[in-house]
């Protein structure tokens, strides 16, 4: 079921209360809901900075995806990334200023880690379900995340 808002730019889709992890989460049209957040995968290949900028322009509060537990990571892999040809996506975790001060672009606390070491931006290798540091200038697909 969905919201019948009259504004095309305010199209929202609310998940049925019977749909488990998506129950009661209202997201922009084309986005998927999980645990009070909305997610959307984009196949466009962009460097990290351009992908983050693109995400911030999609919806208020939207950034490159941040992951806070294995259940959320599994949701992204199974529900979102399955639409992408490449199993590698940008994540919002970075240290672009080389200060050893890792943080999510959405301001969330770094409370879950699954990475290999090197470079200043992170990709999520979905087939292996782990994160890898990589050069921020490379190009990858990405997932945007926004509060519902």
Swiss-Prot record:
Signal peptide: 1-23
Keyword Nucleus among UniProt keywords: no
One CC-aspect GO term: extracellular region
GO molecular function ontology, one term from the record: toxin activity
Limits of the C-type lectin domain: 34-145
Subcellular location: Secreted
Tissue and organ expression note: Expressed by the venom gland.
Oligomeric form and interacting partners: Heterodimer; disulfide-linked.
Name of the featured protein: Snaclec 3
UniProt lineage: Eukaryota, Metazoa, Chordata, Craniata, Vertebrata
């Amino acid at each position: 079921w969905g919201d019948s808002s009259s504004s095309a730019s305010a199209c929202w889709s609310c998940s049925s209360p019977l749909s488990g992890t998506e129950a009661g989460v209202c997201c922009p049209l084309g986005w998927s809901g999980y645990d009070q957040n909305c997610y959307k995968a984009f196949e466009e290949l962009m460097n990290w900075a351009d992908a983050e900028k693109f995400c911030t322009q999609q919806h208020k509060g939207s950034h490159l995806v941040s992951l806070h537990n294995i259940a959320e990571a599994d949701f992204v892999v199974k529900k979102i990334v399955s639409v992408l040809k490449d199993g590698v996506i940008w994540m919002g975790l970075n240290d672009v200023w080389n200060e050893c001060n890792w943080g999510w672009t959405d301001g969330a606390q770094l409370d879950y880690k699954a990475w290999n070491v090197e470079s200043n931006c992170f990709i999520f290798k979905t087939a292996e379900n782990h994160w890898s540091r990589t050069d921020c200038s490379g190009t990858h697909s990405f997932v945007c995340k926004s509060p519902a």
